Amino acid sequence: MRPPLLLFLTVTVLVSCASAVSTGNAAELRSLRSIKTTTNDDAAEEERGGFYHKFDLNFLDDIFHGLPEQFQRMRNQPERLRTMFENWKTGWMSVDDAVAYMTREGLSEKAISQFKAAYQAYLKHKG
């Protein structure tokens, strides 16, 4: 081999190895647009740059006043919650219309108040 070709290959290999970034095994500990790492729900919110709401429904509420499947998914899957709220917002559904819809779906008063607060927070977040 010629020396310039050998030198070129060596430099290419060294540069490619040095510039490769390892993602690591712990994806939840990765840095998201900041210097510090995150290990809580803030990571999902910052990564998506979206709305996140924590519901105050406990185990007894699930037993005595079970949520319909759609609202269970909205409570447990933040992306589903954002999608449904965006659909409501683009369909010009007001908060009162949303409450009427939840009443027709058979949600308990506590669940309605939780989802109403979440929808109001979403509308405020979206501006």
Curated annotation (Swiss-Prot):
One of its GO terms (cellular component) is extracellular region. This is Secreted RxLR effector protein 3. It is found in: Secreted; Host cell. Secreted effector that partially suppresses elicitor-induced cell death in host and enhances virulence of P.parasitica. A motif (RxLR-dEER) lies at residues 30-48. Residues 1-20 form the signal peptide. It comes from the Eukaryota. Induction: Expression is induced in presence of citrus root extracts or during the interaction with the susceptible host. The RxLR-dEER motif acts to carry the protein into the host cell cytoplasm through binding to cell surface phosphatidylinositol-3-phosphate. Belongs to the RxLR effector family. Its main location: secreted.
